[in-house]
A protein has these predicted regions:
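Short alpha-helical transmembrane segments in multi-pass integral membrane proteins
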Residues: 1-21, 79-146, 188-243, 299-364, ...
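N-terminal transmembrane alpha-helices
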Residues: 8-40, 44-45, 59-74, 78, ...
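Transmembrane helical elements of multi-pass membrane transporters/channels
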Residues: 19-38, 140, 174, 203-207, ...
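Transmembrane alpha-helix boundary and packing residues in multipass membrane permease domains
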Residues: 24, 28, 40, 77, ...
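Helix-terminus/linker motif at the lipid-water interface of multi-pass membrane proteins
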Residues: 29, 33-52, 121-128, 184-191, ...
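Small-residue-rich hydrophobic transmembrane alpha-helices
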Residues: 51-111, 148-167, 273-337, 368-390
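Short runs within selected transmembrane alpha-helices of multi-pass transporters and secretion channels
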Residues: 72, 141-159, 167-175, 196-209, ...
Length: 450
């Protein structure tokens, strides 16, 4: 592997991590932007029921997307390991096996979302006026799930190769297509939530075609043969990394779906306000998410190269970068949350409800700078079972019980429900700091024994 921008085993940690993270962040910003455009256009040109439908439906789609992304993290880490170990010839089998596994996964998700869209919408306690529109949104997105899964897998492959710029291009094109689709189908033809769903699927399809074309043209340090496209031994390796992350992410997103259901019981206005707040939250979480994804690739290369000391230094660098931006976002959300909510809806009551939720959620923007940097380190170190375990504790023992108790209070408010996220993340930070110190002491004992 050449000593270029994709080699993380030497040079300034801050510079290398930042240069890799910026395109990742850019891609996440654009991805959140085209998700926000759906809500923005439906909020301006559709109905209140349509706004609620996109809010609830996108929560369901987010669950699927985030689980697929975490499963694909196993592919990213394994590719980075092989590059760090100077064994790129193994990567062809990784890519071929991943293509087969994720195709099988897509078929299962397709059947679930298309065949059970309405029961899922009812289970989510979508307001009665919005059940039909929510089911339509979920069904259409489910029909295009092959493109959504393929996009996330291809982006994971490029990041594993140390290329975070190409995924930025993919999502930029997708964003442009989605905006055009929303304006034509929702604003122009009045298709409401269904139009937003069609635009989303079309955008992902175009980005997948572009990604495949670039991968074919890219000068790769390995060969891919037809024989690689099977359930080969590499599948077990990347699944052993990705499955714990996917399960943890599934339960985390399930907890947010449950939270959405708790909010939906408070009425249509609260549901729409929460949907608006969720889009703002998606933007607020972009920097921690970019750090976690970048950290996993950065750490995996250094672990593959046998440089654990450099991998550890990158954690502190990541936390420092995250805290600077996290504090700025916290101040923005607390001081101007109502202005941000007003971007997505002209309804004063919806804006007020959205701001209520943001007030409770705001501390999360600081805490995740620490948590996500550490999780990226553990992911790159193949400590994904721990990542899963701490995630289960946060989700099942803290976030869900806290949100449920807050939602059934006589004076229930979105601010109190919003506190569930930072409270559970604080517990996660304490758990991960403890585990990091435990591993550090264990490593030092082994070194002294040697």
């Amino acid at each position: 592997m050449s000593t270029d921008h994709s080699d993380f085993t030497q040079g300034s940690i801050l510079k290398k991590l930042s240069l890799f993270m910026l395109p990742v962040l850019g891609a996440l910003i654009l991805q959140a932007a085209y998700g926000a455009v759906d809500l923005l256009v439906v909020g301006r040109f559709g109905s209140t029921a349509g706004l609620s439908a996109v809010s609830t439906g996108s929560q369901i789609l987010n669950l699927v997307t985030f689980v697929v992304t975490q499963l694909a993290m196993g592919v990213t880490v394994l590719i980075a390991w092989y590059l760090g170990e100077k064994r790129p010839e193994q990567i062809g089998a990784v890519l071929g096996g991943a293509a087969v596994v994720f195709t099988i996964l897509s078929v299962g998700i397709f059947i679930l979302l298309v065949g059970f869209a309405r029961p899922i919408s009812v289970l989510m306690q979508a307001p009665e006026e919005a059940v039909g529109l929510t089911a339509s949104y979920v069904r259409i997105c489910g029909g295009g799930i092959f493109f959504i899964v393929a996009y996330n897998l291809l982006s994971a492959i490029f990041r594993g190769l140390g290329d975070s710029r190409s995924p930025l291009l993919f999502v930029l094109v997708a964003c442009i297509v989605n905006i055009a689709g929303d304006l034509i189908l929702v604003a122009g033809f009045g298709m409401d939530a269904a139009g937003a769903a069609i635009a989303t699927v079309l955008a992902q399809a175009v980005s997948v075609v572009l990604a495949v074309a670039l991968l074919i043209r890219k000068k790769l340090p390995f060969a891919i043969t037809r024989a690689d496209f099977r359930l080969n031994p590499q599948c077990r390796k990347f699944l052993s990394i990705g499955l714990p992350l996917a399960l943890q992410e599934f339960l985390t997103q399930l907890s947010f779906l449950a939270l959405c259901a708790f909010v939906n019981r408070l009425g249509l206005t609260a549901s729409s306000g929460y949907g608006v707040a969720s889009k703002i939250v998606n933007f607020a979480m972009l920097i921690p998410s970019a750090l976690m994804q970048s950290m996993a690739s950065f750490v995996a290369q250094n672990v593959g190269a046998g440089d654990q000391k450099r991998a550890k230094k990158s954690v502190l660098t990541g936390i420092g970068v995250g805290l600077v931006f996290g504090c700025a976002v916290f101040a923005l959300v607390m001081l101007k949350g109502d202005v941000l909510a007003g971007i997505f809806s002209p309804d004063a009551e919806v804006v007020q409800k959205g701001f209520e939720y943001l007030k409770g959620f705001a501390p999360e923007t600081i805490l995740t700078a620490i948590l996500f940097s550490m999780l990226g380190y553990f992911n790159g170190n193949n400590k994904t079972l721990w990542v899963m375990a701490q995630g289960l504790i946060q989700t099942l023992l803290v976030r869900l019980p806290f949100a449920y108790v807050m939602s059934i209070q006589p004076n229930a408010s979105l601010t109190k429900i919003g506190l569930a996220a930072p409270v559970s993340t604080l517990v996660g930070v304490l758990l991960n700091v403890g585990f990091y110190l435990y591993l550090d002491r264990k490593e030092k004992r082994v070194q002294r024994a040697d």
